[in-house]
From Swiss-Prot:
EC number: 3.6.4.13
Species: Arabidopsis thaliana
Taxonomy, superkingdom: Eukaryota
Compositionally biased intervals (Polar residues): 74-96
Motif (DEAD box): 273-276
Domains (record comment): The Q motif is unique to and characteristic of the DEAD box family of RNA helicases and controls ATP binding and hydrolysis.
Low complexity: bias regions: 27-65
Domain Helicase ATP-binding: 155-325
GO CC entries: cytoplasmic ribonucleoprotein granule; P-body
Summary of the function given for this chain in its UniProt record: ATP-dependent RNA helicase involved in mRNA turnover, and more specifically in mRNA decapping.
UniProt name for this protein: DEAD-box ATP-dependent RNA helicase 12
Residue positions, PTM Phosphothreonine: 230
Keywords: ATP-binding, Cytoplasm, Helicase, Hydrolase, mRNA processing, mRNA transport, Nucleotide-binding, Phosphoprotein, RNA-binding, Translation regulation, Transport
Gene: RH12
Entry-linked InterPro entries: DEAD/DEAH_box_helicase_dom (IPR011545), Helicase_ATP-bd (IPR014001), Helicase_C-like (IPR001650), P-loop_NTPase (IPR027417), RNA-helicase_DEAD-box_CS (IPR000629), RNA_helicase_DEAD_Q_motif (IPR014014)
Length: 498
């Protein structure tokens, strides 16, 4: 906000100037004659000529007083214009909207190529949704420049209070599509849980809560994340402090709710990220029980890349006239090029070594179908001389958290994991995904390859396919409507490194 604006003289008028200046009044009083002398003069001064001279003297003093005011930029044509500009400085600065934007600490612009998955927008700006100024500041400083297609469709509808069932590709901005309206609707002066975001994995909960904290850093909104595998006592202590937004996995939140420490009677918004996974047999019983603690006038926001039959049944049971958004005319990301290499099982490690030597890898994620194979492969890759982390569901939670954050921060180039890491994990530097073991389902394949090519950028997916995997690969192509091409001897870096 521009602070170099014109003001009334200190202590004069009722405008937006500084509070009354006692020094000014003191000097002003010193210029006046004593009170008794003033009465003597009034009683004595009956001459009209003397009265006229006294009035002129008072007018001169007033003009001198106004001349001491700080001058505004530009030449005002008359005093009325000056007063109008003085009393309404913020309105003019808000009108052009430049002052507050000039103070933003923006991250370096991302100059990488982006596909139509995120650029095929209607041309809207975040300001078109009349969001809070402090939320807009957080959005821009997070690096969000304009709404992506899923954000354009979701944000205005969510702000009206309608239920939403949204389907969009991995890595196209779904997290921002629900975090922004949730943060906009939260009242920071009401210290109750007003919104809840449910996710299927602990890593995704940590990532989502971090996004919420970064977007709301200028708002006084308290975000709490809670997942299994962490201290229940710490969560109970935290819930005795103000919490406005709760992010976590269904099982842990249900546990805290049953204990009476997590009170959801004022939680009017429920977000389900990766909704298809939350409605699987693993999570649905906890989810259904958790919903019973919510108020009747709750709002549901459901987001995912795939919606099986279980989602439709849940929608019919709980959602009220939901607004359905489907941006999945093509299931796989436009920017991800997919190849396969026919290999024997015993040749896979050698083939992987060849890929490492030929590909320009920023960061890669390598998927296996079992915990044992993850650990064995990570050991082999380390023996080949490449830096490598691994992560799977049987690891201690603190170790999982450390691996996740260090890989995200670029401490290591390669990560070997199970399907634990396929849901929603957003690491912009990952440009190569390798399916060391071909996934068992087309749904798993879709989420795996979606770890590269995030937010419209380019990526590469390479599948090591054995004789037994041929039918699964063909079935995946048919179900997803995509083509997996044979790998060429030389891969053009332009298709995954721009």
């Amino acid at each position: 906000m521009n602070t170099n604006r014109g003001r009334y003289p200190p202590g004069v008028g009722t405008g937006r100037g500084a509070p009354p200046n006692p020094d000014y009044h003191q000097s002003y009083r010193q210029q006046q004659p004593p009170q008794d002398q003033q009465y003597v003069q009034r009683g004595y001064s009956q001459n009209p000529q003397q009265m006229q001279l006294q009035q002129q003297h008072q007018q001169q003093q007033q003009q001198q007083q106004w001349s001491r005011r700080p001058q505004l930029p530009g030449n005002a044509s008359n005093a009325n214009e000056v007063v109008q500009q003085t009393t309404q400085p913020e309105a003019s600065s808000d009108a052009n909207g430049q002052d507050w934007k000039a103070t933003l600490r923006l991250p370096p612009p991302d100059t990488r190529y982006q596909t139509a998955d995120v650029t095929a927008t209607k041309g809207n700006e975040f300001e078109d949704y009349f969001l809070k100024r402090d939320l807009l500041k957080g959005i821009y400083e997070k690096g969000f420049e304009k709404p992506s297609p899923i954000q354009e469709e979701s944000i205005p509808i969510a702000l009206t209070g309608s239920d939403i069932l949204a389907r969009a590709k991995n890595g196209t901005g779904k997290t921002g599509a629900f975090c922004i309206p949730v943060l906009e609707k939260i009242d920071p002066n009401n210290n109750v849980i007003q919104a809840m975001i449910l996710v299927p994995t602990r890593e995704l909960a940590l990532q989502t809560s971090q996004v919420c904290k970064e977007l709301s850093k200028y708002l006084n909104i308290q975000v709490m994340v809670t997942t299994g595998g962490t201290s229940l006592r710490d969560d109970i202590m935290r819930l005795h402090q103000p919490v406005h937004l709760l992010v976590g996995t269904p099982g842990r939140i249900l546990d805290l709710t049953k204990k009476g420490v997590c009170v959801l009677k004022d939680c009017a918004m429920l977000v389900m990220d990766e909704a298809d996974k939350l409605l699987s047999a693993e999570f649905q019983p906890s989810l259904e029980e958790l919903i019973q603690f919510l108020p009747q006038n709750r709002q549901f926001l459901m987001f995912s890349a795939t919606f099986p039959v279980t989602v439709k049944a849940f929608k019919d049971r709980h959602l009220r006239k939901p607004y359905v958004i489907n941006l999945m005319d093509q299931l796989t990301l436009m920017g991800v090029t997919q190849y396969y290499a026919f290999v024997e099982e015993r040749q896979k490690v050698h083939c992987l070594n060849t890929l490492f030597s030929k590909l320009q890898i920023n960061q890669s994620i390598i998927f296996c179908n079992s915990v044992n194979r993850v650990e064995l492969l990570a050991k082999k890759i380390t023996e080949l001389g490449y830096s490598c982390f691994y992560i799977h569901a049987k690891m201690v939670q603190d170790h999982r958290n450390r691996v996740f954050h260090e890989f995200r921060n670029g401490a290591c180039r390669n990560l070997v994991c199970t399907d634990l890491f396929t849901r929603g994990i957003d690491i912009q530097a990952v440009n190569v995904v390798i399916n060391f073991d071909f996934p068992r389902t087309s749904e798993s394949y879709l989420h795996r390859v979606g770890r590269s090519g995030r937010f419209g950028h380019l990526g590469l997916a390479v599948n090591l396919v054995t004789y037994e995997d041929r039918f699964k690969m063909y079935q995946t192509e048919q179900e997803l409507g995509t083509e997996i091409k044979p790998i060429p001897s030389n891969i053009d870096q332009a298709i995954y490194c721009q």
